Regions:
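Periplasmic/cell-envelope proteins involved in peptidoglycan metabolism and beta-lactam response
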Residues: 1-245, 337-342, 505-531
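Beta-lactam-recognizing serine transpeptidase/beta-lactamase-like catalytic domain environment
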Residues: 61-63, 224-267, 275-508, 531
Length: 531
């Protein structure tokens, strides 16, 4: 090769190399290219969505009571080893699967490890190990949206836009944090709000503790007498809202909110007839021989025991079926239906949009033209069905001087950062349905029922108590041929100045270990000490 050709070749190589250097210099000087390169080596991680919480009437949290920690794990056997002992089985499996991963990830740990050089971020655990009112609050689906209860009914408020906080992690090709740089925590405002309920956390805890000790199936409701605000709602058995799948095959329907379901009522309905009689100016006497015959059908008092000469007060205290059958005949079907409807039977009670109690069932006027059906209705049997929520509203009307209020649950929405009230939920209107004189007379009769009648298991409380028992036939039998009963107690406490209306139902029982009146008494004792 001639010298001239060699020189030309070297010149070409030199110019080519110079061009490459110029291009590299150009690229390095362009900030947009630098930004793109940085973005390509930045890993973005999302933290769990911030969901609005539930709060009690005093602003105390009902959800998010426990904190959990999410550790930001960068590749490296040392990090995996340090985290392995601080996480649960699911976290350990994640660490094992990610041992060869070239990118950071989040894993839940049981403590804050920031001081040990592992960045950690706090998040609330939605449901505590001992969750409160799971059937009422509900639970979330796999996407973090409400699947049942108030979680579902108020999902839009609690979720907001669903925007999540993010972590921007500048990493090397191996997935480690780049030297001299830090993780950026970008906080998002989803617009989610908290919801304050009328529940009282302390009353709810007390009711749940009593139910756990005394009941296998059933519910307990507690209302504030003056406002009909729901202070506690317990349904047993319960379930873990953090792991609802674990209870899918569990017996006795743990997902069922028994407070909102309709049941056969029994003698706890008798105050309705007593109210109708007092409003009509009737207070007859009756000589009970233990049974009454209506169109050839025999209706017996409990155990067929005669009560002798009884007036309205004694008949209510002794739960005399014969007296109330005769009273129903004297009042007539129309008067009974009107009184029952005025006290809330036969109409549903909405606690939130999308969360409504069953309406129950009132017999029709035509059905009650049959004397046997009227007799059944007069002591709370037959086709009559009612929810514990309806029964609580009826008893609360008596305790509140004859003023009916539908029970309510929602108070207002909250700014969770400041605790400031944002907007109040509408409350049901009050309606006088009994005269003050009728309500006062019924309160005295119900006090006597506890002091001397069928509800003596609720006697001896400080300040006294008042209420009515009920044992309702269901027409359902066990394999051994024993009929399942619904065992009720509805009353208020203290009798001298009622603060709480309480309903206890044990459903589908053949024989309860503790009577519903005794369950009521245990809860009243707890409420007395709460002050």
């Amino acid at each position: 090769m001639s010298g001239r050709r060699v020189l030309a070749l070297y010149a070409a190589l030199l110019f080519g190399f110079a061009g490459v250097l110029c291009r590299l210099f150009y690229l390095a000087s362009r900030t947009d290219y630098a930004a793109r390169a940085a973005a390509q080596s930045t890993v973005t991680l999302e933290l769990p969505a911030r969901r609005g919480g539930f709060y009690d009437c005093m602003g105390l949290p009902l959800t998010g009571l426990e904190k959990r920690w999410l550790a930001l794990c960068f590749p490296g056997q040392e990090n995996y080893t340090r985290l392995y002992a601080c996480t649960d089985t699911a976290g350990q499996e994640l660490l094992y699967r990610s041992r060869s991963r070239a990118a950071p990830f989040l894993v839940e740990v049981d403590r804050d490890m920031t001081a040990l050089g592992i960045p950690c971020y706090a998040a609330s655990r939605r449901y505590a190990a001992a969750p409160l009112c799971p059937q009422l609050l509900g639970y979330l689906d796999g996407e973090g949206h409400g699947a049942a209860g108030l979680e579902k009914a108020l999902d839009a408020l609690l979720t907001g836009s669903g925007a999540r906080d993010t972590l921007l992690c500048p990493v090397t090709a191996q997935g480690n944090l780049r030297t001299g740089e830090q993780v950026q925590h970008l906080q998002a405002d989803s617009g989610a709000v908290g919801v304050r309920l009328t529940l009282s956390r302390s009353v709810q805890r007390a009711a749940e503790a009593v139910a756990a000790q005394t009941m296998t199936t059933g519910c307990i409701l507690v209302l504030d007498v003056r406002t009909a605000a729901l202070r506690a709602c317990v349904s047993v058995p319960g379930f873990d809202p953090a792991d609802p799948a674990a209870s899918l095959e569990a017996p006795d329907s743990p997902f069922l909110n028994r407070a909102l379901q309709a049941y056969a009522v029994g003698s706890v309905f008798k105050p309705v007839l007593a109210a109708a009689a007092l409003e009509a100016g009737l207070a007859p006497e009756y000589d009970c021989n233990g049974a009454v015959v209506v169109d050839g059908q025999i209706f017996r008092c409990a155990g067929g025991v005669p009560h002798g000469e009884v007036d309205l007060s004694a008949a209510l205290a002794k739960s005399c079926n014969g007296y109330f059958i005769r009273l129903g005949q004297q009042l007539g079907a129309q008067a009974l239906l009107q009184q029952a409807q005025a006290l809330g039977f036969g109409r549903s009670i909405g606690l939130a949009e999308g969360l409504t109690a069953q309406s129950g069932a009132l017999p029709g006027a035509e059905e009650l033209t049959q004397s046997g059906q009227l007799a059944n209705f007069s002591f709370g049997q037959g086709s009559l069905l009612a929810t514990p929520l309806q029964v609580s509203a009826m008893m609360n009307t008596i305790a509140n001087g004859g003023v009916y209020r539908a029970p309510c649950l929602l108070d207002c929405t909250l700014d969770e950062t400041s605790g400031e009230e944002l907007s109040a939920f509408a409350r049901p209107q009050a309606e006088r349905v009994l005269t003050e004189q009728t309500a006062a007379a019924l309160r005295t009769m119900l006090e006597q029922t506890v002091a001397e009648g069928t509800a003596q298991d609720a006697s001896g409380l400080p300040g006294g108590a008042a209420g009515k028992t009920g044992t309702a036939q269901t027409g359902q039998f066990t394999a051994e041929g024993k009929e399942r009963m619904n065992l009720w107690f509805a009353g208020f406490y203290p009798a001298e100045d009622p603060q709480y209306t309480i309903v206890v139902l044990q459903d589908g029982q053949t024989q309860a270990a503790v009577s519903s009146a005794a369950v009521f008494a245990q809860l009243c004792t707890a409420l007395h000490w709460l002050g």
